């Protein structure tokens, strides 16, 4: 399995989630299989998004796309996102 992990903060979670949901089809067309959004339990707007992708090449291509950059700007992402690409090594 191929994974992409994105860490960033947002100005307003609900506004961010609305934009995130609006680009669902774009993510799917580029190979996204599923996602999980995680928030810190202290109520902050620091998010971690874990995506399962069909392959790492598609994940990297999507992460570098102008469409993603534009969506992040519209969604109110603050600061520079941290993006990691991972392959599953073991599962329990």
Annotate each PLM feature.
Residues 1-66, 70, 74-92:
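Short S/T/G/P-rich N-terminal loop/turn motif that feeds into the first structured element of a domain
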């Amino acid at each position: 399995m191929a994974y992409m992990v994105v860490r960033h903060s947002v100005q307003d979670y609900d506004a961010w989630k609305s934009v995130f949901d609006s680009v669902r089809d774009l993510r799917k067309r580029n190979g996204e299989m599923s996602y999980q959004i995680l928030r810190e339990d202290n109520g902050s707007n620091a998010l971690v998004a874990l995506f399962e992708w069909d392959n790492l090449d598609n994940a990297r291509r999507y992460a570098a796309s102008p469409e993603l950059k534009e969506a992040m700007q519209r969604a109110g992402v603050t600061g520079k996102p941290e993006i990691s690409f991972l392959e599953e090594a073991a599962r329990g």
